[in-house]
Amino acid sequence: MFRKRNLVLESFRRFDSGNVETLISWVLCSRTSKPSLFCTSVKPARLNWEVSSQVILKKKLETALKDHRVDDAWDVFKDFKRLYGFPESVIMNRFVTVLSYSSDAGWLCKASDLTRLALKQNPGMLSGDVLTKLSLSLARAQMVESACSILRIMLEKGYVLTSDVLRLVVMHMVKTEIGTCLASNYLVQVCDRFVEFNVGKRNSSPGNVVKPDTVLFNLVLGSCVRFGFSLKGQELIELMAKVDVVADAYSIVIMSCIYEMNGMRDELRKFKEHIGQVPPQLLGHYQHFFDNLLSLEFKFDDIGSAGRLALDMCKSKVLVSVENLGFDSEKPRVLPVGSHHIRSGLKIHISPKLLQRDSSLGVDTEATFVNYSNSKLGITNKTLAKLVYGYKRHDNLPELSKLLFSLGGSRLCADVIDACVAIGWLEAAHDILDDMNSAGYPMELATYRMVLSGYYKSKMLRNAEVLLKQMTKAGLITDPSNEIVVSPETEEKDSENTELRDLLVQEINAGKQMKAPSMLYELNSSLYYFCKAKMQGDALITYRKIPKMKIPPTVQSFWILIDMYSSLGMYREITIVWGDIKRNIASKNLKTTQDLLEKLVVNFLRGGYFERVMELISYMKENDMYNDLTMYKNEYLKLHKNLYRTLKASDAVTEAQAQRLEHVKTFRKLVGIV
């Protein structure tokens, strides 16, 4: 009693005398309404400190909050909580709201900590609106961990968060790499809860869950592309199909980026035929889609397909008419995720003409292979260089000649011939000349002279004689002896198309460097099909082909295999995959990613391999990768809530049990489970 009295007196001293007199008068005047607070006898009145101090502190807190005096409110709140615990729900809601409106990170941090503590003691103390305001304020301040923590609390309690507000919170979160990691994991959690509540129809669900919308997925998928979380992006695409969210035009382009990063050409090819006869204003929007598809054709070293795609784009044949596709252009179209031969596979709905007006999304990178001007798609010099290099490497120059003429006529052929001469590919340049002449489209004299000049410079006199005869036969010249070796005209033309020449040199040098072979992309595609079909035997045979061919696996190879084992609950097999990953890391053949390691952690938690869990968490810390401890904690509580909770080290029978017990306790301590 004496201690509480001193605290109240100290609180009085923080206010001026006028305020104190006012408060005392207010308390004394309340005798009529609250007679129990004071003695009604004729003896001198004695203040009941136990009751009156609580009333006074409560009034002071309300006044400070009303006047937005955050410092005073915090001091009074601390005194109140020390004496009486948390104030009533109305005051707490007001207090957290006032703190949420602060632009100071310190007050926002206190609001977040206070909220978690209050909800731990009384789960219903704070309203959903207050938690929503707090999460938005935290996200704006880039306190993404705290913001995500509040979002997860609301999800667990069944508070419905409107789509507009959730978009705002997530939009601020995904501005950073850690925020993207948290937002993607939260979106996975929302989708899982939505499927559980709406498909499982469980009565124990805490409340309804709003279905994530297209814009929310686009925000998170776009940030996955921006920060390189392509594997997490792939998981979200499959979740998009699982919860039946329609992919709009933005979604398709963002998904194309993820498929390109993961080397999934077959998945991206499915979209091409469904884009349909889009309006001219949308053609530019799909520039990155075709850029990514063309990139994959080059990665697979499928030069023929790359050439046909380039020709289709330039001739606008890629945009198949809607009538030929046999469906209404306004209705969402259905695509299989994985092979269409898998009957039980997921299917995603797409609407290529739909653009969300409130979506400030898109791909913020420049297209490499496709340009867009005058309402038309075209290819860049980078694409042209890759096509020329690819066709020559595959010894298929006649097809190259046909493609060049179809793309740009004689002018483009002349540019390519000039570039070939500049880098010393004289015979290739001569072959293109012959092909064009055979097709009935002979080149101009200046182009012939360019090749002839190259022959003379390289001392290839026999080839020069052959070319002179051809020029004479074609009627381009009458006297071969009058042809000078190098004329000012040819010297000037040598420097005209330097960009194409330089890009060809880059392609030649890049071809000499060690890269992921095209065969690896083919094997990964087969592996993806077998894993989605749950064909373990064929999947393992395909996976084992990779090291046998002396090709180092990619993170996509491991992700695909882990995803299959995870869907089958075969966690022991995932430990074997982790061993393969470590061997490839040690041999410097593999650079792991945060999303791959995080997937391993979650699966080892599900399987109860806590030694592997701690090993991975330590490895991620050493390599400056973010660990979503709250997600780990939630995963643990779903499956192992009471595991070894009361056991001691002395209770272990074997050394293995003792070690397992120690790993579990270490994990519980790390994620904050007491």
UniProtKB/Swiss-Prot annotation:
Keywords: Repeat. PPR repeats lie at residues 409-443, 444-478, 519-553, 554-584, 593-627. PROSITE patterns: PPR. InterPro entries: Pentatricopeptide_rpt, TPR-like_helical_dom_sf. Belongs to the PPR family. P subfamily. This is Pentatricopeptide repeat-containing protein At4g17616. It comes from Arabidopsis thaliana (Mouse-ear cress). The lineage of its organism: Eukaryota, Viridiplantae, Streptophyta, Embryophyta, Tracheophyta.
